[in-house]
Amino acid sequence: MSSSRPVFRSRWLPYLLVAPQLIITVIFFIWPAGEALWYSLQSVDPFGFSSRFVGLDNFVALFHDSYYIDSFWTTIKFSTFVTVSGLLVSLFFAALVEYIVRGSRFYQTLMLLPYAVAPAVAAVLWIFLFNPGRGLITHFLAEFGYDWNHAQNSGQAMFLVVFASVWKQISYNFLFFYAALQSIPRSLIEAAAIDGAGPIRRFFKIALPLIAPVSFFLLVVNLVYAFFDTFPVIDAATSGGPVQATTTLIYKIYREGFTGLDLASSAAQSVVLMFLVIVLTVMQFRYVESKVRYQ
């Protein structure tokens, strides 16, 4: 019986092939994480020339800071809205395009367009449309007696950044959902239709369970996206306002580290955010993946 394990002529070749990825991981992930952990235990001057070990004082100060607690819950709320809304909307459009016979190529291309737009550009686009004075959407809302001004209304500001973030990510989610739906054997759908199952029942009883692995993958990806990659959207759309209503943890880290020059507090917040993402990811793999059936 032959073994399928690859055999290399040189014992060093496998390590050589893995080395580039290991170097990138060390330089861009492990090293910065170690630096953040070290600075989080220090009291650092604004220019980083001198430091003094203070232990966990920076973390204690964080959790006694009401603004930090507010940004923590804002992050949880924002990430939940972006992740859940993004997945549901993308799945809806993927299922819709799946059942469109004529012109499906046009709709596929249309759904992929947001992916080509930079996050900051996406934010500026929706700022123009939601501009309180000249925006097309705000003019339409005013016709129905609804006053829109996201610069003064915290709820409207949160809606704007969530909406822009979901719109930016919808193409990525759509692509995976649509490919997953296309991979479902037609015989299963046709057999269910012969048995009298309608389109909605076929989707929830056959299609949705079969695309569960893709859904779980996108759940993890969208959670990371909501925590980190939405920074340009928030920065361009609201700058964390009004009154820090849209200041997420990642934006607060930037503001304290690069604007306030409080390197120690910024590092401590980075460590807390890192552990928060790790805990949420482990929980997803522990409790959500256990319900996913892989083929």
UniProtKB/Swiss-Prot annotation:
Q: Where are the transmembrane segments?
A: 12-32, 81-101, 110-130, 157-177, 208-228, 263-283
Q: Name one GO cellular component term.
A: plasma membrane
Q: What Pfam family is a match for this entry?
A: BPD_transp_1
**GO annotations under biological process?**
transmembrane transport
Q: Topology: which residues are Periplasmic? A: 33-80, 131-156, 229-262
Its record classes its membrane topology as:
Multi-pass membrane protein
Q: Which residues form the ABC transmembrane type-1 domain?
A: 76-284
Keywords noted in UniProt: Cell inner membrane, Cell membrane, Membrane, Transmembrane, Transmembrane helix, Transport
Query: Which CDD domains has this protein been placed in?
Result: TM_PBP2 (cd06261)
Indicate the quaternary assembly.
Answer: The complex is composed of two ATP-binding proteins (UgpC), two transmembrane proteins (UgpA and UgpE) and a solute-binding protein (UgpB).
Physiological role: Part of the ABC transporter complex UgpBAEC involved in sn-glycerol-3-phosphate (G3P) import. Probably responsible for the translocation of the substrate across the membrane.
Family matches, as NCBIfam families? PRK10561.1
* Family, per entry: Belongs to the binding-protein-dependent transport system permease family. UgpAE subfamily.
Q: What is this protein called?
A: sn-glycerol-3-phosphate transport system permease protein UgpA
Q: Which organism is it from?
A: Escherichia coli O157:H7
